[in-house]
Amino acid sequence: YYLYFPAKDRDGIFRMGVAVSASPTGPFTAQPDYIPGSYSIDPAVFVDDDGSAYMFFGGIWGGQLENWQSGAYDPDGEPPSGADPALGPRIAQLTDDMLGFTDAPREISIVDQDGEPIPAADERKRFFEGCWVHKYGGKYYLSYSTGTTHYIVYAVSDDIWGPYVYQGRILNPVRGWTTHHSIVEFSDKWYLFYHDAALSGRDYQRSVKYTEITYDDEGRIQTIDPYGD
């Protein structure tokens, strides 16, 4: 079992660590160093049908993704703005031992229905952090938090490397800032796990929630109202 986590190195730069255990309940033993070539936050690992494994990751602002636009860390890096294409999450294939990358991470392109990149100014659709990938109907579903607008949205691709075409919202806003999530299949049903601060009545102290998600005949995820009947 492999537990992936972000942590800052001695220079204050986020990297990805990995800890290994013989049991999902632990104890997990961390590797002595971070994964070479890793950066930013919010790792999510997807294992494809052929057994190949991939890490998706990234987050802007506090997640430092904007500092890596040149491929090297720039402490003065600023995220794109206005009509410029928004930053996309990163993808890297994992080595067979699950402890490293086979190559340098690549940026994932998220585009609209016309094939145009989602602009940085479109905070309803642009990537912010907390990505996840699952596979349904032979297609790859990339879901992520929009951050400031508090949506979980998704984009779809025929190729794991992208580009991913924006489709719409999975979850309307919940209380508690961003909505880091995961999507899993269990007993022939699909479920969304996410967090929400409604129980605490604050914008922090979030609780874990889950709800079933459904797809229409064309594979579109039906938008969820978290506080509806």
Per-range role (PLM):
Residues 1-229:
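Carbohydrate-active catalytic/glycan-binding domains of CAZyme proteins
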